[in-house]
Design a protein with these regions (language model features):
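Short glycine-centered segments of the SAM/dcSAM-binding site in methyltransferase folds
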Residues: 78, 135, 159, 225-226, ...
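Glycine-rich beta-strand-centered segment in the early N-terminal region that forms part
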Residues: 21-39, 48-86
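Mid-domain Rossmann-like dinucleotide-binding core that forms the NAD(H)/NADP(H) cofactor-binding site
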Residues: 114, 118-186
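NAD(P)H dinucleotide-binding glycine-rich loop of Rossmann-like/cofactor-binding domains
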Residues: 56, 78-140, 181
């Protein structure tokens, strides 16, 4: 079968289109003929060797796939699934506990871009204990998790503020119906948030950029505000000032989806709710770009440029 391999850590150029044996079946796993593959920033971190607990070269990257199960508990069904790695391939072994038949309302490309983004967004909002009419600010709002979080928060009655890095993405967010859109390139973007929020602060911030934005987050949160950190796209984890946390009784939560996947029961309950939203078309993954598997390096370059929106998909 055709795969993408990482034989040494490095930039997108280390992604090699090559041949590999089809995986042998194992108990508790289903072999899936892959129709579409979700590209995540975690894939880039694995490629560079910066993903916590990530694989050593040589390996096949890729965390989520959609396709037809040819063996396992879901044999014959179209499923989406999460794998430890190995998704950038024509066939993938998917744990039965992390494979979910998907409704006809989703295309294969949308299914491949569903699990990581929507589960991350779901757990982030659950950790934040989002309530109707609360003010939610999403950093990197045009990305996969950002768009998923906005769709879910809209169902929960939140007032949503989105931060994005370019005029083009800001316009796209406005056209998608986001209530408040602010460009992070604007020197006074914090003032813009304060103005649009009525000056009384933000209840919840979903943070995936890291670095200097952490200090801005703490300035924007109102007393008893909640900061949910699920990434550091800037490459700089940043620092939190305890004095700022104490001053306004702020709380900080960290979210790493991989750790939450250790509870299949919790994931199954979350997916029941998310898939019902999908059936009712209350949530729909936004596909920003589709590349052939052989062009995985170009997909990584686009993702790392931060010029993309929604989800990037590979097709075997």
């Amino acid at each position: 079968m055709k795969v993408i391999t990482v034989e040494s850590y490095g930039g997108p150029e280390v992604l090699k289109y090559s041949e590999a044996p089809t995986p042998a079946t194992e108990p508790g796993f289903g072999l899936v003929k892959v129709e579409a593959i979700g590209v995540n920033f975690a894939d880039c971190m694995m490629r560079t060797g910066h993903y916590p607990g990530g694989p050593q070269p040589a390996f096949v990257p890729g965390l989520e796939v959609a396709g037809i199960a040819v063996s396992g508990a879901h044999q014959g069904k179209r499923i989406m699934g999460i794998v430890e790695h190995g998704g950038y391939a024509e066939y993938a072994l998917v744990p039965d506990a992390l494979a979910f038949p998907y409704p006809t309302e989703l295309s294969a490309e949308q299914a491949a871009g569903f699990l990581v983004t929507y589960l991350t967004a779901y757990y982030a909002l659950w950790m934040a204990d989002l309530k109707p009419d609360e003010k939610l600010l999403i950093q990197a709002a045009a990305g996969g998790v950002g768009t998923a979080a906005a769709q879910l928060a809209r169902q929960m009655g939140a007032e949503i503020f989105g931060i994005t890095s370019s005029p083009e993405k800001a316009e796209w967010l406005r056209q998608s119906g986001l209530e408040h859109v602010i460009e992070s390139s604007d020197y006074n973007y914090r003032e813009a948030v304060r103005e649009q929020s009525g000056g009384d602060g933000i209840d919840i911030i979903l943070e995936s950029v890291g670095g200097a934005t952490l200090a801005a987050d703490l300035e924007l949160l109102r007393p008893l505000g909640r900061l949910i950190v699920y990434g550091a796209l800037s490459g700089d984890p940043g620092h939190l000032h305890l004095g700022q946390l104490f001053a306004n009784s702020l709380s900080v939560h960290a979210l790493h989806l991989r750790s939450l996947l250790q509870s299949p029961e919790s994931v199954s309950m979350a997916m029941d709710e998310l898939l019902e939203y999908a059936r009712r078309k209350k949530v729909q993954p936004v596909i920003g770009a589709v590349y052939p598997l052989a062009e995985a390096a170009e997909a990584h370059r686009l993702l790392e440029s931060r010029a993309s929106y929604g989800k990037i998909i590979l097709k075997p």
